[in-house]
Swiss-Prot record:
Top-level taxonomy: Bacteria, Bacillati, Bacillota, Clostridia, Eubacteriales
UniProt-annotated binding residues for UTP: 13, 188-193, 224
Protein name: CTP synthase
Disulfide linkage: none
Pathway(s) it belongs to: Pyrimidine metabolism; CTP biosynthesis via de novo pathway; CTP from UDP: step 2/2
Protein species of origin: Pelotomaculum thermopropionicum (strain DSM 13744 / JCM 10971 / SI)
Known catalytic reactions: UTP + L-glutamine + ATP + H2O = CTP + L-glutamate + ADP + phosphate + 2 H(+); L-glutamine + H2O = L-glutamate + NH4(+); UTP + NH4(+) + ATP = CTP + ADP + phosphate + 2 H(+)
Catalytic site: 381, 507, 509
Functional note: Catalyzes the ATP-dependent amination of UTP to CTP with either L-glutamine or ammonia as the source of nitrogen. Regulates intracellular CTP levels through interactions with the four ribonucleotide triphosphates.
Gene giving rise to this polypeptide: pyrG
Other facts: CTPSs have evolved a hybrid strategy for distinguishing between UTP and CTP. The overlapping regions of the product feedback inhibitory and substrate sites recognize a common feature in both compounds, the triphosphate moiety. To differentiate isosteric substrate and product pyrimidine rings, an additional pocket far from the expected kinase/ligase catalytic site, specifically recognizes the cytosine and ribose portions of the product inhibitor.
Pfam families: CTP_synth_N, GATase
Record: residues binding Mg(2+): 71, 141
BP-aspect Gene Ontology terms: 'de novo' CTP biosynthetic process; pyrimidine nucleobase biosynthetic process
E.C. number(s) listed in UniProt: 6.3.4.2
Amino acid sequence: MAKFVFVTGGVVSSLGKGITAASLGRLLKSRGLKVAIQKLDPYINVDPGTMSPYQHGEVFVTEDGAETDLDLGHYERFIDINISRSCNVTTGGIYAAVINKERRGEYLGGTVQVIPHITNEIKERVLSVADDSLADVVITEIGGTVGDIESQPFLEAIRQLKGDLGRGNVVYIHVTLVPYLRAANELKTKPTQHSVKELRSMGIKPDIIVCRSELPLSKEMEEKLALFCDVEKEAVIQALDAPSIYEVPLMLEEEGLADIVLDKLGIKTGPPDLADWREMVERMKNLRYLTTIALVGKYVSLQDAYLSVAEALRHAGFYHGSAIEIKWINSEEVNCANTEDLLGSADGILVPGGFGDRGIEGKIEAIRFARERGIPFFGLCLGMQLAVVEFSRNVIGWRGANSTEFDPYTPYPVIDLLPEQRQLSDKGGTMRLGSYPCKLVPGTLAYRAYKKEIVEERHRHRYELNNAYRADLAAKGLVFSGTLPDGYLVEIIELPGHPWFLATQFHPEFKSRPNRPHPLFRDFIGAARKYKESRYS
């Protein structure tokens, strides 16, 4: 039978509950346990797929095509597992399921209420992850902050689960902030005390308190928190600000978090094997080089909108012994007159995915600059589509070439809506989503990176290269180095003769790991390193 760990947050949002949960997952896995992990999100959207990146940050896509919270990306990267759509549950999804059951008559004419119907549905989602994964431990993060009205059904459900499963099978971890008041030159424990009091008023007594803070807690403060929050002193865990999120698992291991969790769950394991993780962190702390990548997008004011891209770049940097400096370039500000000023110092240029026509011409201008100057270029999803548009306009000479997403009346619709998308009216969950195979052409950059013929990558798009123009594009030198195995859809394009110019219709960033960078990101940063060396040699 699986054991369950629930992670809640208090005082303020964005404390790092997701990093805490992911780090615990890594520590448990290092002890030989099979770990499953999920997030319960209190917003009423069914999923974040239609939410603005400014509201939510990036949408992380799973292997099975779920559009999920960005914390699931942390889970995959830290624990090195692929998780499924069942691992992200929202209030909207819960209510939709309950209402559908009511319409089908599954409640026998009863009055449908938050308790028991909504809470039972939540409990079923938590337990189903354990059943499907056959995990030893299931970690569940509850989004939001204790006291939020939206979180109440989730907190009630996890309260009930302790009674359903037995006390020895459930652990509650509460992540809080211990703020530092500069004027008083001291840390304050009162917000944590009040947060725990609020949580206990809902029937949940935390077993472990993880204290986020800028400065170390004194022994007296730990004892005070243990006394007022009614936990053992050893269960007051310090989580200091870290230079890198990848140091957090090692910091929490030193604090004894995993050992306390296992003791409370009655699980005995061998010692942790964190040698690879320690080696990676040590390598990360001793990077010898600096590589500058210009990321040209329209959501750059909120860098979480490109979280997986930024992490994948850093992973590749670790591999090459290089720190990565990301220049966040607003594509709306890029034009032919300022590309040198904005992009001239970059060792590589990356255009990520996105939607809508705002900032499109700036991205195309950035791609032109990379192509003409021989700067390594990497395009992702929309970045590939715009690379095709730029090539069509400026190499072939098709004036007005565009995607029908931005110009339905373009004379050269080199990017067009996928045929299966034409009859769809709903926006949510209707794109080409999830993992699909891609067949690579030997001798290309893509094949040299992957070193195999068939790869699987994750997608999130409605538009694709228009096959009516493939022959003309190829005749002018564009190489289609990756396609669906049947050859129907183009997945990767390249420009031979350029030091490194490659773009993908898929999102390789979602499969990168800190100790195993994605092959394309690895080779992109390698090319950027060579470009930088050639400039200064």
